[in-house]
Structure formats: structure tokens, C-alpha cells
Amino acid sequence: MQNITIINTRCANLSSVKFAFDRLGYHTEITDNIEKIQSADKLILPGVGTAKAAMQNLADLGLIEVIQSLTQPVLGICLGMQLMTDYSEEGNLDLLKLMSGKTEKLPDCQLPLPHMGWNKVHYAADHPLFAEIAQDSYFYFVHSYGVLPNPHTVATCDYGVPFSAVIQHNNFYGAQFHPERSGKAGALFLRNFVENIK
């Protein structure tokens, strides 16, 4: 059985992520222990709130360089995905720099912010994270900042303008939506991360 570890960023609804994996039959552990993080088979980097608070928490826990040096698959969720980029406009902040790109406030398109609720996700053909998930399936979003499409974009969503719904570089994967709150499609997405990503 794979060792799936949820990094305790102290700024996320960690229990809902854990329950999502529990429902799929996977054992997970929530921890900020460096040795456990480094020895995990798969890692989840969740986050809600501000980038500044999240980066400060990771710094206080001594986890920034630990995360940057990981070689196993890591899935960032919502703010956790944004933290994987170089920089955030929210607080003019350097982030984890796991892949190029920046996090910026979604443009004013006469739509309310935060972008909250169900929206369609369009993914690149044959990506293993989307195995058995219908094209343009709906996923659940809650965010005001996002990553505009770039070479690391695997899937997009549109909220007045297109933005990255999923990004990837090497072993680092990020989802702007909340798979743990996205019904059957979200459950399949988490299963695919565990089973299909090596």
C-alpha cells in the first residue's frame, strides 16, 4: 500500500482532504514531520487563505527547502497549486519556485470574485490525471487568484478569461479546484494521482 502524506501547512481544511482519500480506501497521514514527508510515496500540499500566511507557515516549519527537494509526486490543491509557481501578486511574494509562472488576481470581467462554485475543466488529451474523466467535467472552485495558461498548463477553466485548472512540471502537479469537493470527477482525479502518477 502506498504511503500518502498530506503536508500540514496549517492553512487548509486538512480533514476534508484526508476523508476524500479515506473514502477511496487509501490510508493517509497528516504531518509536518520532515522525515515522514521525505519518505512518503505521494504527497499532498493543500492550502487555503493567503499566500503570505502559507509561505510563513512553511518557513516556520522548516519545510520550504524540503518541499523544493522532493522527487516523489506532489499534488498541490488550490492555494497549494499557486504556491508551486515563482511569484504571487498577492503580497508581492516569492513562492516555492517549483515551476515557472506567476499567480495573479483574476482579471475584472464583470464576474464576482472569488470565483466560487462548479465550472468546466478542459484537459489535454490522454493526461493520466484525467483517465476515465469526461472532457469538460465540472469541478469545484473557490479562488480570487490564479495562474494564467503557460507551458506547464495541463488543463484550463474559463471565468471570463481562461486560467490554469491543472499545472505540472516534473514531479510537481497542481490543481486549482478542490478535488475533495468535486464529487465523482474529483474522486477519480485523486485516484488517478495515486494510481497513475509514478
UniProtKB/Swiss-Prot annotation:
Reactions the enzyme catalyzes: 5-[(5-phospho-1-deoxy-D-ribulos-1-ylimino)methylamino]-1-(5-phospho-beta-D-ribosyl)imidazole-4-carboxamide + L-glutamine = D-erythro-1-(imidazol-4-yl)glycerol 3-phosphate + 5-amino-1-(5-phospho-beta-D-ribosyl)imidazole-4-carboxamide + L-glutamate + H(+); L-glutamine + H2O = L-glutamate + NH4(+)
PROSITE patterns hit by this protein: GATASE_TYPE_1
Pathway in which the depicted protein is active: Amino-acid biosynthesis; L-histidine biosynthesis; L-histidine from 5-phospho-alpha-D-ribose 1-diphosphate: step 5/9
Stretches assigned to the Glutamine amidotransferase type-1 domain: 3-198
GO BP of this protein: L-histidine biosynthetic process
Active site: 78, 178, 180
Enzyme Commission (EC) number: 4.3.2.10, 3.5.1.2
InterPro entries documented for this protein: Class_I_gatase-like, GATASE, Imidazole-glycPsynth_HisH
Molecular function via GO: glutaminase activity; imidazoleglycerol-phosphate synthase activity; lyase activity
Main localisation: cytoplasm
Gene3D superfamilies with a match to the protein in the record: 3.40.50.880
Description of how the protein assembles with itself and partners: Heterodimer of HisH and HisF.
Functional description taken from the UniProt entry: IGPS catalyzes the conversion of PRFAR and glutamine to IGP, AICAR and glutamate. The HisH subunit catalyzes the hydrolysis of glutamine to glutamate and ammonia as part of the synthesis of IGP and AICAR. The resulting ammonia molecule is channeled to the active site of HisF.
Protein name: Imidazole glycerol phosphate synthase subunit HisH
Species the sequence originates in: Pasteurella multocida (strain Pm70)
